């Protein structure tokens, strides 16, 4: 979905207040602009910080030397986590945490979680990355994108489902569900450590 309407007023939402004390900012993740990606973002410099504030539904780009806020993305996500620099775009794990109430007073959830993509050249172009397997989380959650010459791999962690999902473009090619005797054991902070070995192993599995 492109160019979704901004969601400004959900910062008033007091989700998970029965579990945690409410924090007005709750900075929950930071990603450093590395040399690998800095050439794709000419308005930013290597070392600039991409910082997520869960409670404000906001992601900031900050110069760590001057503390200048170079950019702000507000109202695009709800209770997001894990913003990442990529090759000319930014991805954010959008929990889309929101509960409604059905006719008998039970809490219901209208939306799954998602990964959004913000194009650097045209920042008004906001896309939801489409995958053939859904995931849903209230907090945490992370993603890692690996682009090769001919495809894009996405690693997605849905912590409270105990899900680790690996996608080749939009197709799920590997899943790990961390359940034990009906209990979910949460995952957190998955990352592709050896990019070359991942591609080699996937190619071997295809043969």
Residue spans of the language-model regions?
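Histidine-/acidic-rich catalytic cores in large beta-rich domains
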Residues: 1-207
């Amino acid at each position: 979905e492109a160019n979704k309407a901004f969601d400004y007023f959900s910062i008033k939402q007091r989700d998970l207040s029965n579990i945690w004390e409410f924090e007005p900012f709750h900075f929950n993740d930071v990603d450093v602009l590395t040399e690998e990606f800095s050439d794709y973002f000419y308005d930013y410099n290597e070392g600039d910080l991409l910082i997520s504030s869960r409670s404000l539904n906001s992601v900031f780009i900050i110069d760590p030397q001057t503390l200048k806020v170079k950019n702000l993305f507000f109202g695009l996500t709800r209770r997001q986590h894990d913003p990442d620099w990529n090759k000319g775009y930014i991805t954010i794990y959008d929990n889309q945490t929101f509960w409604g109430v059905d006719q008998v007073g039970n809490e219901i959830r209208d939306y799954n979680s998602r990964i959004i993509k913000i194009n650097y050249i045209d920042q008004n172009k906001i896309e939801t990355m489409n995958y053939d397997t859904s995931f849903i989380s209230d907090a945490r959650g992370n993603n890692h994108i690996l682009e090769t010459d001919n495809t894009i791999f996405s690693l997605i962690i849905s912590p409270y489902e105990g899900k680790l999902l690996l996608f080749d473009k939009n197709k799920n090619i590997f899943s790990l569900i961390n359940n034990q005797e009906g209990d979910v054991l949460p995952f957190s902070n998955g990352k592709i450590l050896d990019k070359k070995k991942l591609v080699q192993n996937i190619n071997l599995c295809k043969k």
